[in-house]
């Protein structure tokens, strides 16, 4: 098993308010126009972009997003690697910034004709060897959770917990379960 990865620090609303207003407004507009993303994906994109632009505030003098260059973005990516984030976390943050840049290129072509997406496929994410350690429920935690759900009469969640715990299936696999296959 690899080394345990660190989690990104959350950017609070207070910290976010210190970020260049132009960048904050552009992020907000970008998120509002991502109608193809689920609510959970939007939350992740918002978090990834907040982390990035707070880093820009701290390390690039709060530069506007349309002025950032490739070498400056690479410093951010190296910062994430040095912090001990997992490879998948770094790739996701890279994807957020790239999607944001593509949005600017498409929507603001007239206003910023020389702007290009500075996040490119040539920028490889270093394999860090860091992973997030999975912490399965202990038998006592499982019993306590089942008891709490039963006390709340939340039988659907109780059935899900019992099924997934006893079979070891993943969330996506559990969704595929059909009532027709359950035998009395």
Report residues per predicted region:
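N-terminal DNA-binding module of tyrosine recombinases/phage integrases
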Residues: 1-37
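Short helix-capping and inter-helix turn/linker motifs at the boundaries of alpha-helical repeat units
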Residues: 21, 67, 136, 150-153
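N-terminal core-binding DNA-recognition domain of tyrosine recombinases/integrases
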Residues: 25-132, 147
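Internal amphipathic alpha-helical segments of the cytochrome P450 catalytic fold
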Residues: 42, 87, 157, 171-172
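Alpha-helix N-cap/helix-start motif at helix boundaries, enriched for small hydrophobics
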Residues: 45, 97, 160, 168, ...
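Basic, Lys/Arg- and aromatic-enriched nucleic-acid-binding interface segment
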Residues: 139-171
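Conserved tyrosine-mediated DNA breakage-rejoining catalytic core shared by Y-recombinases
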Residues: 176-184
């Amino acid at each position: 098993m690899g080394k345990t990865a660190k989690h990104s620090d959350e950017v609070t609303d207070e910290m976010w308010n210190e970020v260049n207003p132009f960048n904050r407004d552009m992020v907000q507009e970008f998120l509002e126009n991502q109608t193809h993303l689920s609510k959970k994906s939007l939350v992740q994109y918002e978090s990834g972009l907040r982390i990035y632009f707070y880093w820009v505030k701290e390390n690039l003098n709060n530069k506007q997003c349309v002025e950032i260059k490739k070498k400056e973005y690479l410093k951010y990516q190296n910062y994430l690697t040095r912090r001990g984030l997992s490879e998948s976390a770094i790739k996701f943050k890279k994807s957020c910034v790239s999607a944001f840049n593509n949005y600017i290129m498409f929507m603001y072509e007239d206003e910023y004709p020389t702007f290009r997406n500075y996040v490119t496929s040539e920028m490889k994410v270093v394999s860090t060897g860091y992973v997030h350690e999975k912490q399965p429920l202990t038998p006592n935690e499982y019993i306590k959770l089942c008891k709490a759900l039963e006390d709340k009469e939340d039988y659907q969640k109780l059935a899900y917990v019992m099924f997934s715990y006893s079979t070891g299936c993943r969330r996506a696999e559990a969704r595929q379960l059909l009532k027709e296959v359950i035998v009395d």
